[in-house]
Design a protein with these regions (language model features):
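Acidic, surface-exposed loops and disordered segments
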Residues: 1-245
């Protein structure tokens, strides 16, 4: 429980490799994570070579910590094995996998797998930071990873021994996230309360201190015209995930 409640993102890492035994335990935990009807629609690709980590740092918008961390994991929604199973049984697959609910299933399983990897890594004293920008240059990432049709890179994860103690970001009030019985849309007061707390955090933290609050950050991030990952629609079509509904 202490590990779960003390999570923080690490972006500076020691020049120290991760022991093979520990990496194997992380991957075992990923495979043991919950999934949909045991179809196991994820794959995790381990990138350790320095040159390749530098390449992924570049593809993910110049995030230097990807090159610095000794291990970069790429989590993929993977329906290729399912395609092989259907092909073996003489069953058509493309019209099924292109329905949007399958993409949601794959994204759900990737999230569960990555969360499992984070907790397992941190239980060994390692630090992590998830990387959403693996989709920024999606076609190059697919080429670098040799991904076939029906496999989509969803998230990356830096893993290594921490070289910093950045502290934790304050979270939203529990009442704004966890509800009893039904959703509560009356959140303005809670968001105002959180804005005040977050503004103090941003102003007083020892690194990258600035003036701002949470609602301002959220609105700025999603300011129109929003097109954070422009390659994604075409990439999903190429990989077989294109809804017909």
């Amino acid at each position: 429980m202490k590990t779960l409640l003390s999570h923080r993102s690490i972006r500076k890492y020691q020049n120290r490799p991760i022991e093979k035994e520990i990496l194997d335990e992380i991957l075992k935990a990923v495979q043991a994570a919950p999934n949909w009807v045991n179809l196991q629609h994820i794959s995790a690709i381990v990138v350790q070579e320095q040159q390749r980590r530098e390449k992924f740092a570049e593809l993910c918008g110049g995030q230097k910590h990807i090159a610095q961390a000794p291990v970069f994991l790429v989590f993929c929604a993977d329906f290729y094995r399912t395609w092989l199973a259907c092909k073996e049984k003489g069953q058509e697959f493309d019209s099924v996998v292109s329905q949007i609910d399958n993409l949601i299933v794959g994204a759900n399983e990737v999230g569960i797998a990555l969360g499992t990897a984070v907790v397992t890594a941190e239980s060994f004293g390692l630090g992590t930071v998830p990387i959403g920008d693996i989709q920024l240059h999606a076609f190059e990432a697919i080429w670098e990873l040799n991904l076939l049709k029906y496999v989509v890179p969803m998230l990356g994860l830096c893993v290594g021994y921490p070289a910093e103690e950045p502290g934790q970001k304050p979270r939203l009030p529990k009442e704004a996230v966890c509800f009893e019985g039904k959703y509560n849309s009356d959140l303005k007061g809670l968001l105002k309360q959180y804005d005040e707390q977050y503004a103090v955090y941003l102003r007083e933290r020892p690194w990258n201190s600035r003036v701002g609050d949470w609602t301002g950050m959220a609105a700025d991030f999603y300011r129109p015209p929003y097109c954070h990952y422009p390659e994604v629609p075409e990439m999903l079509a190429q990989q077989g995930f294109l809804s017909q509904r």
